Amino acid sequence: MGAVADLKRRGYNPQPLRRVHIKKSNGKLRPLGIPTMKDRAMQALYLMALNPVAETTADRHSYGFRRERCTVDAIVQCHTILSKEVSPQWILEGDIKGCFDHISHEWLLNNIPMDKVMLRKWLKCGFVFNKELFPTEEGTPQGGIISPTLANITLDGLQTMLAEKYHKKFVNRKTIYYPKVHLVRYADDFIITGRSKEALEEIKPLAVSYTHLRA
């Protein structure tokens, strides 16, 4: 009970993150920023309020780091889109390199619907590596409890943008244009479908520009 009562906003300042590296399947190292137990508990407390808000604006076909969703759901959606005779024949595959490490702090502070003072403290707390303190000027740590939700909010909206720009067009209730543009995203990995290579070549710079402004 004492630990719970200690989770107060007044006078709270997070400790610097502990930087560790884990080996990925390709042999490269992934940096993780590990908050203290108290800081993780405080993030979990604020995440309880942020998650329901994030769900109301989330992309419909975003499946990573969301409750009641998993990789199987993403696979099923891909099958639904691509298994028909009239399905799109072209796919643009995207992987936002170093997404967590390069998310714009300015964008987060301007757009995340939560206490900005607390968010700024978490983003700017720095990290310790080899007993040396380093500043954090961008990104949100992969070891943070709230980080996956922050990343999802950052990337949400791309599906809506594409749907508004590439939608079915009708004349006398007959479809005259069907671009077959669909987005399926799992965390920072996604695919975009299209009816032709030329269509995806047009879409690619839009997707790059959208993510570049945020991450």
Predicted segments, located by residue:
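Active-site beta-loop-alpha junctions of metal-dependent nucleic acid enzymes
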Residues: 67-73
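Conserved phosphate-binding loops in nucleotide/dinucleotide-binding enzymes
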Residues: 31-32
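Conserved small/polar residues in nucleotide/adenosyl-binding loops
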Residues: 211-215
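Residues forming anionic-ligand binding surfaces in small-molecule and nucleic-acid pockets
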Residues: 24
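Active/ligand-binding-proximal structured segments within catalytic/core domains
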Residues: 41-50, 150-151
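Conserved polymerase palm-domain catalytic core
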Residues: 6-10, 15-16, 20, 60-61, ...
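Charged boundary/loop elements
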Residues: 48, 52-64
